[in-house]
């Protein structure tokens, strides 16, 4: 589903822990890292797509997280011309995204990157809050900066009043 401007509707997911760290996932078979994200299907709300993508990409369900915030507006990024599939119709030139900030309420061990026959990620780790802005692929950097700026006060407030969660190691490889 591509809009009239050539953008694919999409959700992005920032998962944080009680220390204010965020989950950073390594793309399957690659050296690039990013937050979970995925397309919104026809007839699906952004929140429904977020829960579907959350399960497909990291094996978490509604019971494992709580929604802390979502971006006020849709955020867009353009794909580099070399990544645009010019032979498809309609042509998708980028993504327009609604972002969600989630707090992990379950143990880290619940994260499972192997729920799909074609996994998006093969590893993950907790990183400092601003780390992804510097590390994400360049064409997504402005969107990441805007998302993290919008969610910063919510995440920082968690550190002042953290809920009790089970502790677990800071880095996990794929489960399965």
UniProtKB/Swiss-Prot annotation:
Record-level GO cellular component terms: cytoplasm
Top-level division of the source organism's lineage: Bacteria
Keyword field contains ATP-binding: no
Motif (Nudix box) on chain: 38-59
Molecular function as annotated in GO: mRNA 5'-diphosphatase activity
This enzyme's EC code(s): 3.6.1.-
Cofactor(s) listed: a divalent metal cation
Domain Nudix hydrolase: 6-149
Coiled-coil stretches: none
CDD domains cross-referenced by the UniProt entry: NUDIX_Ap4A_hydrolase_plant_like
Function: Accelerates the degradation of transcripts by removing pyrophosphate from the 5'-end of triphosphorylated RNA, leading to a more labile monophosphorylated state that can stimulate subsequent ribonuclease cleavage.
UniProt protein name: RNA pyrophosphohydrolase
Species for this entry: Salmonella typhimurium (strain LT2 / SGSC1412 / ATCC 700720)
């Amino acid at each position: 589903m591509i809009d009239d401007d050539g953008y694919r509707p999409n959700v992005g997911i920032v998962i944080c822990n009680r220390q204010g760290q965020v989950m950073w996932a390594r793309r399957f078979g690659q050296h690039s890292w990013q937050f979970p994200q995925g397309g919104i299907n026809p007839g699906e709300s952004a929140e429904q797509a977020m829960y579907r993508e959350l399960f497909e990409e990291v094996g978490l369900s509604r019971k494992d997280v709580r929604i802390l915030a979502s971006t006020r507006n849709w955020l867009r990024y353009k794909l580099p011309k070399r990544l645009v599939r010019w032979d498809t119709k309609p042509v998708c030139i980028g993504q327009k995204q609604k972002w969600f900030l989630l707090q992990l309420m379950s143990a880290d061990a619940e994260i499972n990157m192997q729920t799909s026959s074609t996994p998006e990620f093969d590893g993950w780790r907790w990183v400092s809050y601003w780390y992804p802005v510097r590390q994400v692929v360049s064409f997504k950097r402005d969107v990441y900066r805007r998302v993290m700026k919008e969610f910063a006060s919510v995440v920082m407030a968690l550190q002042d009043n953290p809920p009790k969660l089970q502790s677990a190691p800071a880095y996990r490889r794929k489960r399965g």
